[in-house]
Design a protein with these regions (language model features):
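Alpha-helix N-cap/helix-start capping motif
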Residues: 33-34, 159, 181-182
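Adenylate-forming
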Residues: 174-182
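ATP-dependent adenylate-forming carboxylate-activation enzymes
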Residues: 154-169
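Short glycine-enriched loops at secondary-structure junctions
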Residues: 82, 105, 132-135, 182
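Conserved AMP-binding loop of ANL adenylate-forming enzymes
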Residues: 113, 117-146, 150
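Conserved acidic residues
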Residues: 23, 125, 175
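Nucleotide 5′-phosphate-binding alpha/beta core
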Residues: 1-87, 93-110, 114, 118
Length: 182
């Protein structure tokens, strides 16, 4: 099982790596995000003063309301670079839309790849995916992409259909099930 080197570093080494990226990230946001440029200006935040993780507390927390009301202002890339639009279910209010590039989807896959790797999942495993990849459920896509990156087998069924679920379990003999309790 391959786990990238950074995942095995000490807390101090990870923090040092993260802090090395802070200036470039903040400059990128200031240049490319209408939302964060406005936040920096309205709160008199000088991004060059933010050097450590602890300094990030100078930036106001982004709320769900911000995401709902100003979603387009978060975009940092041209719209032509957006390959996937996903909207939350809106369980606790209005749905929130996330526009993702290929790089964002790669990061989503990486996050789940690491999670599955930490659970000792390998390319020899087969998972029955009993959640949807659509219908405003972002985690389904994340699980799918993470398992693909890992090289594990995937049986895509989605939720419900108990008889088909059991038939597939008997036919394909998955080593794991991915479900969400309701």
């Amino acid at each position: 099982m391959f786990i990238p080197e950074i995942e095995m570093k000490s807390v101090e080494e990870i923090k040092k790596s993260q802090e090395a990226h802070i200036p470039g990230l903040l400059e990128y946001l200031d240049k490319n995000s209408k939302y964060y440029r406005k936040v920096f200006q309205q709160n008199n935040i000088k991004i060059s003063d933010i050097k450590a993780i602890e300094d990030l507390t100078k930036i106001p927390v982004t709320t769900k309301d911000n995401l709902q009301e100003e979603s387009d202002d978060f975009l940092c890339v041209p719209r032509k670079d957006i390959v996937d639009f996903v909207t939350t279910s809106g369980t606790l209010g209005e749905p929130v839309t996330f526009a993702m590039t290929n790089k964002d989807l790669d990061r989503l896959a990486y996050n789940e790849f690491i999670s599955f790797s930490c659970a000792n999942t390998t390319e020899n495993d087969i998972f029955q995916l009993m959640v949807t990849l659509d219908k405003r459920f972002m985690a389904g896509m994340a699980y799918f992409l993470g398992l693909r990156k890992l090289g594990a087998g995937i049986i895509r069924l989605g939720p419900g259909m108990q008889e088909l679920q059991f038939e597939s379990i008997m036919k394909f003999l998955p080593t794991g099930l991915i479900t969400v309790p309701s």
